[in-house]
Amino acid sequence: MSDFLKDIIKETGNEYASLVSDGASGDVTDFIDTGSYIFNALLGGSIHRGLPANKITAIAGESATGKTFFVLGMCKNFLDQNPDGGVIFFESESAVTKDIIEERDIDSSRMVIMPVTTVQEFRHQALQVLDKYIAQDPADRKPLLLVLDSLGMLSTTKEIEDTQAGKETKDMTRAQIVKAAFRVLTLKLGKAKVPLVITNHTYDVVGSMFPQKEMGGGSGLKYAASSIVYLSKRKEKDGTEVIGNICLLYT
């Protein structure tokens, strides 16, 4: 039967198919320390684990909850764990600079910043990176981490064209485009065993009996991500004086 099943895999030409005993592309074989025990426990089920090394992980929250801060911490720990590894950082907010990266003691010579404006641009460039990575001999592949900061700031080709033409109509296709992007990327990431960390914005759900937050961009990321961590904050006071914010994490 084993030979028959192997023949079936060969005949179908499915590049993602394999015997379960040989390991599936979705199997988690390694974890990346996030630099935070709470984050490690939420994402990996143990304070000693962390970010699954071949999954999509989303970090969502309102402004100033530390999304980029935590992501840069993950980049640092990934590079520290993998001295021959690299990070591709897709950036849509123009917020990350060389000074910020080097102040966090991140090896800037092993990190690439790729500014992206639209969902389509991110999808195309991410696929190019993954195809190039998969084309290498498995023995020659060095550890790679992909980051998108942030999905919420990505526009679409249609939105840009409408803005340039002076149209004020809302782009109703964005959610479908986001969903299509992750339909293409999810299997590729699993096959390549490359993790993708995405930050996203949240908004308050209107009309809900109990106040709750929802991610922007439709349901595409919600279904594609293996883990979603929501960040929130509250003010820390000393008497009546506000002395800072406390960030809260929950899945």
Outline where the language-model segments fall.
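The Walker A/P-loop phosphate-binding site
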Residues: 2-110, 122-131
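Amphipathic alpha-helical transducer elements in NTP-driven molecular machines
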Residues: 32-36, 40, 53, 68-69, ...
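Residue-level signature of catalytic and energy-coupling elements of molecular machines
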Residues: 39, 101, 149, 200, ...
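Conserved nucleotide-binding/hydrolysis micro-motifs of P-loop NTPases
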Residues: 93-97, 117-121, 151-154, 202-206, ...
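Phosphate-binding/switch loop-helix module in NTP-utilizing enzymes
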Residues: 118-191
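Phosphate-binding/switch region of NTP-binding enzymes
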Residues: 171-249
